[in-house]
């Protein structure tokens, strides 16, 4: 598949209150956040011209910024209106939406009161559904940091360094993605998604206090309970997963995606029962399109 360069996309990006054509959207090479990972962002999806859970995404974006000491110059309502303006201007139906908040180029000191806070919202036409393909996981050698060492509920660029490294290593070994463990060796998440396991009519998922509690994750839990499925949030060990019959991951970009296998190194665990995952997937699609 031919990749389209993002700067060749037709349309506009909303930057600090203005609509800027894609090809003219630029930042300086000495931008503070480019050097120190001091940015926060959201991953959102628009369906039929409406962003799903936009208020929740916006509130989390502001909380992420505040956790890094960034003062957001816009309210939740103003950010929502900016989304609506961009959707109209770009004639958006289905798209991936990326809001980003970052520090400017006034200084390269670690902290400086004169650093500006900048805000953009970009849209990218949705790619073909990857969620229709099952994936194979490799257990990463890298561990998630202790939750008191970084704001784990902040969706910040810095949080993705380990995820990027882990996924690169997994892909180099022939896998699709990596399963990440926390600092104690319990199952945490995948590189950009939350993970669920299935046995009978019960979902098992790690407690979301050591990694980002995804908005799609919370939505799937709500859907499962509405369908009279039991949901257990627990500390899960790798040794437990061979007792589960199904496995899937959730995230805004991939929605709900089946997991075919997890390679533990000494054995490969296969998951062949997708009935519950497919049920949740159908219900999720119905809701986001509603």
Swiss-Prot record:
Molecular function in Gene Ontology: L-isoleucine-2-oxoglutarate transaminase activity; L-leucine-2-oxoglutarate transaminase activity; L-valine-2-oxoglutarate transaminase activity
Alphabetical UniProt keywords: Amino-acid biosynthesis, Aminotransferase, Branched-chain amino acid biosynthesis, Pyridoxal phosphate, Transferase
Keyword NADP: no
UniProt keyword annotation of Amino-acid biosynthesis present: yes
Gene3D superfamilies: 3.30.470.10, D-amino Acid Aminotransferase, subunit A, domain 2 (3.20.10.10)
Reactions listed under catalytic activity: L-leucine + 2-oxoglutarate = 4-methyl-2-oxopentanoate + L-glutamate; L-isoleucine + 2-oxoglutarate = (S)-3-methyl-2-oxopentanoate + L-glutamate; L-valine + 2-oxoglutarate = 3-methyl-2-oxobutanoate + L-glutamate
Disulfide bonds: none
UniProt EC number: 2.6.1.42
Top-level division of the source organism's lineage: Bacteria
N6-(pyridoxal phosphate)lysine modification, residue list: 155
GO CC annotations, alphabetized: cytosol
Coiled coil: none
Cofactor: pyridoxal 5'-phosphate
Pathway(s) where this gene product acts: Amino-acid biosynthesis; L-isoleucine biosynthesis; L-isoleucine from 2-oxobutanoate: step 4/4; Amino-acid biosynthesis; L-leucine biosynthesis; L-leucine from 3-methyl-2-oxobutanoate: step 4/4; Amino-acid biosynthesis; L-valine biosynthesis; L-valine from pyruvate: step 4/4
SUPFAM superfamilies: D-aminoacid aminotransferase-like PLP-dependent enzymes
Biological process annotations from GO: isoleucine biosynthetic process; L-leucine biosynthetic process; L-valine biosynthetic process
Function recorded in the entry: Acts on leucine, isoleucine and valine.
Family of this protein: Belongs to the class-IV pyridoxal-phosphate-dependent aminotransferase family.
Full protein name: Probable branched-chain-amino-acid aminotransferase
Organism: Rickettsia prowazekii (strain Madrid E)
